[in-house]
Amino acid sequence: MNNLLYARLAKTNLSKNRQNILPYLLSCIGTVVMFFIMDTLAQGSGFDSMIGKDTILTVMGMGTYIIGLFAVIFLIYSNSFLAKRRKKEFGLFQILGMEKKHLAKLLFFESLYLWAASLGIGILLGVLLYRLLFLVLMKLTGLNGTIGFAFSAKAVGSTMLLFGLTFVINFLLSLRQIHVSQPVELLHGGAQGEREPKTKLLTAVLGFMLLGVGYYLALTRQSSMDALDKFFNAIALVMVGTYCLFSAGSIAFLKILKKNKNYYYQTRHFTSISGMLYRMKQNAVGLANICILSTGVLLVISISTCLWTGIEEVTYTRFPHQISIEANTGVSGIMKTVEPVSQKMIEEVKTGIDQHLEEKQLRKKYESDQRYYVMLADVDRNKVEKTQSDDAAASTLIKIMEESEYNQVTGEQVELEPGQALVFQEKQKNYGYDTIELGNQTYEVKKWNTDKKSYVLDEKTQVYETMTVVTRNHEAKEAYAAVQGKEPEGYSWEYALDLIGDAGEQITVGNEIETILTESSFNGWVEVREKERNTVYSLYGSLLFLGVFVGALFLMGAVMIIYYKQVSEGFDDRKRFQIMQKVGMSRKEIRQTIQSQVVTVFFLPLAVAVVHTMVAFPLTRRIMAMLNFPDSNLFLVATAITIAAFAVVYLIVYVLTARAYYKIVE
């Protein structure tokens, strides 16, 4: 046979198998569209000379890798469903006289058609949708970009290469299946059921243990930086644990139900449990995949939408004042470190600021001037010791200030006796101990109810656990030395200023302060809220854009796996339920059995995904704090709304795919 005949035969095969091929082709086109648009955005077209473009391009570049990796895994997994459904077809071809090399050519042309259709339609849709999505991104980030022609040659090349390699892998996997199987095996392969699996007790126990450790990491308290490391560890443990529990734990549970004779020997339960048990090994991977993808959708959408909804709160949390100057001495590795700050340098800078405000006839609405010593230390209950760990995330940020400084900042009048101190700790209304040990010195903790805690705790960072210790005048340096073994090199200084003036005037004053610092050789840095607002919007707007993109991709993956699983199950169950009719079961009883099995299998991944999301809430809340989002209640509401919305979408998918299942079975 010549190649033209193979090409025509491949086209006919694809047309006749459209029930299975069309969903696969649509998923290919969808992933091509998403990857092409994200890669085009990552190329930076239209972002030239735009403030905040580096942030957007970094996020878009990260999204390109995420979507590309998922596309490869998802399309290979989807192809495995197609391969199973077509075993009988390929076996029939061989029995009718086609050799394996002929089937290889047929598969080649089918893969070529699918690849060409996916790329052609996908890139065309990507070009058309790019302009719309570019405008959406600009709206979310609050920036102004120039919409250029969306056809990026580099993005087209990357898309063709990625999906070309994916289709080559799928072609080789399908080819391997044909070459290692005999025609009779292929002819009956699509109809072969699973033998009743043995109870894998060790795997089930391992799954519970991994899930338990993952949940423990998510639920235990830690700093925000430590939470980021533990988040990825917890994800890995929960993913593996989920696969183990769905494959082994579900079988163990079904066998427990089977041993319960009063429950098992009911018509509805007998048929559904038996059917699920015999095929659970095959279903387990699909169910676990649906569960993990559903969890990904819930987490990604809830986090990204919450960050966007509270973006103004994030801005004011990160930049509580219009203008701020900071200079931190002696905390290398985790904060900006500057040369020692002296009293004289501080006064020179403040004098320069006052002179400029007087020249511009601007008045202060608020002014704060904090001077303290800062260090990282290990805190164990009421003991503060020099940090021994190389991991900064495991340490606590300690600020030591004198009572006169505290009184000046808060407006209170605290008088400490010799050996006394005030202690304020993050997230705690009152310090829980009567004494505090700073190295080799012990201080009595004075009870002091205050509503000024936020003035002395560096809550805007939200990264490290924070503790502030207030000592008597002239004792702060001694307290620092008791922990660190040496005196501090100089002050750490925070200066905050709010003006009676508009955004433009605030930016002008901020620029002038930067000039004053440069002329005074003062190695601090200035932050102006209105200047930094663009950066915040660029980051969180692009994160929302990416979150919705990735969430939609995960949702598409879950829907496709659900569809293929339902269709595959329908063909497997059709003969079984025909047998049930022949042995006397009514259509009503059969339909109840079908419904019981489908509902159980279908909604189990959703239930587990919701549990995963709820357990992950404390850990994700800490990560949100690191992103300067302190409102846990808003995050809780956003998560609840996301779960409810996803459940509705999941229910719609159930109704649609259940119809296909019932149509095949009945």
Model segments located where?
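N-terminal Sec/SRP start-transfer signal
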Residues: M1-V32, E196-L201, L210, L245-S294, ...
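Short cytosolic juxtamembrane segments of multi-pass membrane proteins
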Residues: N3-L5, V180-E194, F571-D572, Y662-E666
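Hydrophobic alpha-helical transmembrane segments of multi-pass inner-membrane transport and secretion
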Residues: R18-D48, D54-G91, S111-L125, V205, ...
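Short helix-loop junctions at transmembrane helix boundaries
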Residues: T40-D54, I123-A155, G212-K230, P605-E666
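Hydrophobic alpha-helical segments
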Residues: Y113-L257
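Hydrophobic transmembrane helix bundles of membrane-integrated enzymes that assemble
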Residues: K200-R221, L228-F253, V285-R318, Q322-N328, ...
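Basic-flanked hydrophobic alpha-helices used for secretion and membrane insertion
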Residues: T315-M556
